[in-house]
Amino acid sequence: MKSPVSDLAPSDGEEGSDRTPLLQRAPRAEPAPVCCSARYNLAFLSFFGFFVLYSLRVNLSVALVDMVDSNTTAKDNRTSYECAEHSAPIKVLHNQTGKKYRWDAETQGWILGSFFYGYIITQIPGGYVASRSGGKLLLGFGIFATAIFTLFTPLAADFGVGALVALRALEGLGEGVTYPAMHAMWSSWAPPLERSKLLSISYAGAQLGTVVSLPLSGVICYYMNWTYVFYFFGIVGIIWFILWICLVSDTPETHKTITPYEKEYILSSLKNQLSSQKSVPWIPMLKSLPLWAIVVAHFSYNWTFYTLLTLLPTYMKEVLRFNIQENGFLSAVPYLGCWLCMILSGQAADNLRARWNFSTLWVRRVFSLIGMIGPAIFLVAAGFIGCDYSLAVAFLTISTTLGGFCSSGFSINHLDIAPSYAGILLGITNTFATIPGMIGPIIARSLTPENTIGEWQTVFCIAAAINVFGAIFFTLFAKGEVQNWAISDHQGHRN
C-alpha cells in the first residue's frame, strides 16, 4: 500500500533520493532486538562519555567565579539598570577556604577561551586517525587525558595564568579528537535506519552533562571549595575510561559478546555503503558541495550555541538581573530542554524514514530547518520583549530546546554522504564550527559595552541571521545518499 506521505518525499528517480550510487542497495534486514544489544550498549556508554566530556569542559565556568577575588571583578561590573532587580539580593555564605586570584575580566576571558585553541587543532587529525585505526582508543584516551589535565587545574592555577591557559589548551587538544572518533565508530556500528536514534543518544550526553555539571559545580564550591570541582569530575572521567576500555569494541566483528544475529544485521545493513579504498579521496571530498553544506550549517548553528553557552549567564545576571541562585538554575534549564529534544527527535527521524518512507534527505533538511530557524525566531523574540522575565526565560529555553532537532539533521549527515570517512568529515566541519566558539563571544562582548537591551538585541539578531543563512544553505545543497567518491576510486561524483 502506498504511504500517504510518499508524495512528499523524493521518488526513486529524483536526485534527492537515498539510493546508493553505482552499487545496488542491500536488502533491508529485520532489526535486531534493542534490549541488551551491543550497539545500544555503545550508545549509552558514549552518552556517559559525552556527559563527562562536557562536565570537564564547563566546570571551570562555575569554579572561576569562586577562584577570582571579588574585589578584582567589582570594577568590571557592567550591570544594566533598564530592568528592575528580579528579586532581593541574597547574601551567599559559603566555604572560603579556596585560594583566590586577582584576575581581571580580560584574563578570565583568556582562561576560558584557551580551550578552543587546542580543540581546533586536533579535529581533522583525530578524524583521520580514527578512520585508519578505529575510534575506541582515540576517544577513550581523549577523555582520559582531559580528565588527568583537569586534576592538575588547581596546581596550574598556583603556577600562574600562563600555566592555566596552557593546561586548558591541552584539555582542548584531548577533547578535539572525541567527536570525529565517535563518528568514525558509528560508521561501523549504526545501521542506516537507526543512525538518528543511536547518534542522538550518544551526543545528548553533552547536553545533560552541561545541565548537571553547572549546578553541581556550584554545590561543590558552596559546601567545600573550588578545587574539589576539578578533583571530582577528573576522577569520574577516569572511572568512565576504565569502563569504556573494558566494554567497547571498534567494530561488530571484534566485539566479544555481540550476538551473531545482531552482527549480521549491522553488517548487512551497511553493505555497499563502506569504501574499500586505502587512501582518502581528499580532492573529491573537498570539492563536494554536500560537505560544504554541512560546514556552513555547523558553523552557523555553533555561532548561536557558543554565544549562549558562554554569555547566557551574563545576560541573566547583568540585563535581567536574576540573583546568583536563580541564574545558575535558569542557565541550565535550556540545555535540559535541548537534551530531551535530541532524544525525541532521534526517535522521530528514524520512524519517519523506516515507517513512513520519508527520504533521508527530506528528514535531514526538515530537522535542520526546525533546529535552526526555530531558535532564530525565539532568540530574536527574547531580545525584543524587554524586561518581561518570564517570557525572556521561556523564549531562550524554547530557542535552545529547538536546536536539539539538528542532532538528527546536519549533525549526522556526514554518515549519510560518506560513512567510511565520517570521522574525517566531522573533523573538517567541526574545525570550522569551533571558530564561533573563539570569536563569537568576543564579538558579542564588544557589541554590549553597557549591557543594554538594545545592544543585546543586536547580538541576538546577528546570531539569528547567521542561523537562518546556514539553514537555507544546507537545505539547498545537502544530499542524503552516499556520494560516488566515498565508495569507489571513481573521481567524479554528484553534488
From Swiss-Prot:
InterPro entries: MFS (IPR011701), MFS_dom (IPR020846), MFS_Na/Anion_cotransporter (IPR050382), MFS_trans_sf (IPR036259). Pfam families: MFS_1. The chain crosses the membrane at residues 42-62, 110-130, 137-157, 159-179, 201-221, 228-248, 289-309, 329-349, 366-386, 392-412, 424-444, 458-478. Residues 1-24 are annotated as: Disordered. It catalyses: N-acetylneuraminate(in) + H(+)(in) = N-acetylneuraminate(out) + H(+)(out); D-glucuronate(out) + H(+)(out) = D-glucuronate(in) + H(+)(in); 2 nitrate(out) + H(+)(out) = 2 nitrate(in) + H(+)(in); L-aspartate(out) = L-aspartate(in). GO terms for molecular function: symporter activity. The keyword Magnesium does not apply. CDD domains: MFS_SLC17A5 (cd17381). Keywords: Cell membrane, Cytoplasmic vesicle, Glycoprotein, Lysosome, Membrane, Phosphoprotein, Receptor, Symport, Synapse, Transmembrane, Transmembrane helix, Transport. Signal peptide: none annotated. The modification Phosphoserine is found at residue 3. GO terms for biological process: monoatomic anion transport. Significantly expressed in lung endothelial cells, and much less in liver. Multifunctional anion transporter that operates via two distinct transport mechanisms, namely proton-coupled anion cotransport and membrane potential-dependent anion transport. Electroneutral proton-coupled acidic monosaccharide symporter, with a sugar to proton stoichiometry of 1:1. Exports glucuronic acid and free sialic acid derived from sialoglycoconjugate degradation out of lysosomes, driven by outwardly directed lysosomal pH gradient. Receptor for CM101, a polysaccharide produced by group B Streptococcus with antipathoangiogenic properties. Belongs to the major facilitator superfamily. Sodium/anion cotransporter family. This is Sialin. It comes from Ovis aries (Sheep).
